[in-house]
Amino acid sequence: GDVYKRQTQLRALVRASAFGRIKIMVPLVTCVDELRSVKAMVADIMKELDAEGIAYNKNLEIGIMMETPAACMMADVLAKEAAFFSIGTNDLTGYTMAVDRGNSKVAYLYSAFNPAVLRAIKRIIECGKKEGIMVGMCGEAAADPKLIPLLLAFGLDEFSVSATSVLKTRKTIADSSMAECKALADKVMAC
């Protein structure tokens, strides 16, 4: 059931890569074997397509949506095998803080500014940078003008934000001094 569905979806993505630049991002990763499994499936699909004479991008990138505390803790290992990371801040925050932001009794605990979440984000970026892979971010935090200076100081490569946040995010980035961002990050991370 699930394996067949996953193989069908992956085959469609690999075939679509012949017509434009796409990347495959594996969600909810908790261990390196999950990434290896997807990479093995894609390699098998590529062999099938070669045998069938069907075109595809032979340099298709496979990365990870970094959104679980387990992925954060394994970021150094995962970065050696992933083509890129995208930090999913909404889920990473919720899972790290063990809260459902929709639950009014604990929603006050949901914050990307929590030191545990900031440390998780910083660790993911550092591990990605060490291995030379691109690290992006999606979720509400990527567009937060108060958080952007920290993300710049940590070395985030790419901000994925909603269309309504693009201009404000670009302005915040353009107006940021890296020296000030790093000073702020040093102060915040010392807490």
What are these regions (language model features)?
Residues 28-35, 62-77:
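Active-site glycine- and acidic-residue-rich loops that bind
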Residues 1-4:
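Short, small-residue-biased leader/transition segments that mark boundaries at the very start
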Residues 22-26, 62-66, 85-87, 135-139, ...:
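Hydrophobic faces of well-ordered beta-strands that scaffold small-molecule active sites
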Residues 49-61, 98-141:
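Generic long, charged, amphipathic alpha-helical segments
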Residues 70-80, 142-156:
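Catalytic cores of alpha/beta
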Residues 97-108, 166-188:
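C-terminal helical cap(s) of enzyme catalytic domains, especially alpha/beta-barrels
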Residues 85-95, 150-172:
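Glycine-rich phosphate-binding active-site loops on the catalytic face of alpha/beta enzymes
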Residues 13, 24, 67, 78, ...:
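Conserved, mostly hydrophobic/aromatic
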